[in-house]
């Protein structure tokens, strides 16, 4: 029985409810009156429920889809402005005891190069990332209680935060590790993490169990209920995501929104971020072996509908996607992207050679440098942001959501983005990127409505040019 407030996975992600939702969507996909009503509700910027959004996903009327696209772009601007936050993944270890059939880290893969970073390795990796200009990392590790215990993860976080190379610093560490206990989530909170990220992979229970035949991840309920334990452990910000291509996308989409609704209903705070990865080629993994792949157009539609359905959430697109695809979906509500990513263990300090046995989790589609990504964003009219101020100012969880839902984040995020971009331009940018970036900053400073904030931002931009760092509102 479906119950959004239940703490049992099979009740807040009800298979029966999803099937009824999909049937309802099919029955109403050409119901223009209902579709218009749903779009009008979306314009209120309060979101849509899983049934309403599923009707729009099933709809194939071109002009209605375009209305959704236009609305998604406007909602993103209303909540987040024209900023795009940049981050990089840092793979700590690819040792894993699970048998996930879509991931090359699976236990039975004997020809992947198994690696685990030492603390000395982490210093090299983080120094390389700081030399690019990164300020925000998402650490990743396989599930292995012997090689990757929570104590190892905590030590890595401490090391990462301690590294100050030249003007570099990692100011926010997000964590993407396997589902764990309330006690361990409490330890992660105490370590000062940003967002705890855990992809559901698939919400279809039978498919989930077949795709995860062995290892602790086989337990669907334990995995699906992880975010509740994380929030019980004091973690304010959590990030959801499914791996599109493992099961039918409309089922996954409904499940994803139901999970967001559950977090809001139980904890009063929905997901801080939603990621939309698609299965990609990797070592012994062929994505064509999974027959639920989605087209670029469907992918774009999903991105737009996540934005109108969960307007306050940060939406993340990684370098799994090509530059072409990222061009397509950036206007549809994306607020965070990775740049210059390496999905191999130790890949930043010592990139793997072509003839070397790989340790990558998946092939990276967007191979550009961080400077090239920043340059590209500026030319598209976006502000590349390295900001981590909300996390460090305590604007997390319900405090962040209250500001975001009232569209007040812009009052601090816009100047913060400009100041962190100025830091990047001074310390890391090529001459062309620096020139374009300074022109952008000059234009965007004029858009700050509050005269006092504008004046302070001008002063901080000047101070950054003089060598000072780390200002924030």
Describe the residue ranges of each PLM region.
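Canonical Radical SAM [4Fe-4S] cluster-binding loop centered on the CxxxCxxC motif
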Residues: 80-81, 85-121
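Radical SAM enzyme core and accessory elements
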Residues: 1-37, 327-332, 341-473
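An N-cap/entry alpha-helix motif that binds or orients negatively charged groups
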Residues: 36, 40, 47-84
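Core AdoMet radical
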Residues: 107-124, 128-231, 236-246, 268-275, ...
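Short glycine-enriched, charge-decorated loop/helix-capping segments at active-site entrances
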Residues: 211-217, 288-292, 359
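Conserved C-terminal portion of the radical SAM core fold
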Residues: 141, 195, 200, 221-285, ...
């Amino acid at each position: 029985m479906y119950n959004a407030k239940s703490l049992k996975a099979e009740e807040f992600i009800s298979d029966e409810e999803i099937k009824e939702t999909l049937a309802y969507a099919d029955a109403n996909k050409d119901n223009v009156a209902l579709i218009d009503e749903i779009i009008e509700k979306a314009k209120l910027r309060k979101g849509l429920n899983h049934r309403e959004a599923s009707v729009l996903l099933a709809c194939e009327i071109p002009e209605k889809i375009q209305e959704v696209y236009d609305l998604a772009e406007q909602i993103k601007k209303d909540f987040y402005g024209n900023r795009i936050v940049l981050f990089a993944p840092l793979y700590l270890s690819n040792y894993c005891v699970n048998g996930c059939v879509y991931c090359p880290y699976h236990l039975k893969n004997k020809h992947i190069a198994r690696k685990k970073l030492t603390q000395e390795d982490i210093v090299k990796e983080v120094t390389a990332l700081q030399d690019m200009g990164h300020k925000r990392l998402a650490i990743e590790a396989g599930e292995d209680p012997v090689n990757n215990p929570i104590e190892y993860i905590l030590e890595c976080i401490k090391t990462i935060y301690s590294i100050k190379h030249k003007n570099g610093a990692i100011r926010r560490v997000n964590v993407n590790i396997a589902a764990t206990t309330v006690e361990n989530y409490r330890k992660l909170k105490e370590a000062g993490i940003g967002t705890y990220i855990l992809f559901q992979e698939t919400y279809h229970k039978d498919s989930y169990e077949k795709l995860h035949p062995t290892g602790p991840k086989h337990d669907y309920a334990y995995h699906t209920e992880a975010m509740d334990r994380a929030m019980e452990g004091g973690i304010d910000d959590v990030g959801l995501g499914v791996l599109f291509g493992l099961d039918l996308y409309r089922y996954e989409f409904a499940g994803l929104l139901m999970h967001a609704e559950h977090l809001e209903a139980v904890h009063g705070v929905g997901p801080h971020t939603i990621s939309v990865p698609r299965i990609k080629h990797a070592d012994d993994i062929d994505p064509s072996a999974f027959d639920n792949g989605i087209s670029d157009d469907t992918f774009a539609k999903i991105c737009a509908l996540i934005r109108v359905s969960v307007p306050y959430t940060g939406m993340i697109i990684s370098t799994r996607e090509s530059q072409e695809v990222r061009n397509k979906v950036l206007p549809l509500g994306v607020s965070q992207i990775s740049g210059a990513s390496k999905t191999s263990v130790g890949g930043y300090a010592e990139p793997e050679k072509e003839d070397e046995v790989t340790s990558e989790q998946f092939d990276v589609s967007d191979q550009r440098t961080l400077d090239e990504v920043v340059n590209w964003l500026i030319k598209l009219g976006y502000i590349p942001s390295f900001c981590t101020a909300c996390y460090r100012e305590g604007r997390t969880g319900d405090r962040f959501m209250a500001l975001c839902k009232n569209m007040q984040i812009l009052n601090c995020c816009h100047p913060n983005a400009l100041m962190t971009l100025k830091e990047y331009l001074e310390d890391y940018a090529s001459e062309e990127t620096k020139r374009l970036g300074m022109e952008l900053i000059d234009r965007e400073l004029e858009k700050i409505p509050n005269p006092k904030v504008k004046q302070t931002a001008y002063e901080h931009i000047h101070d950054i040019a003089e060598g000072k760092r780390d200002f924030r509102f």
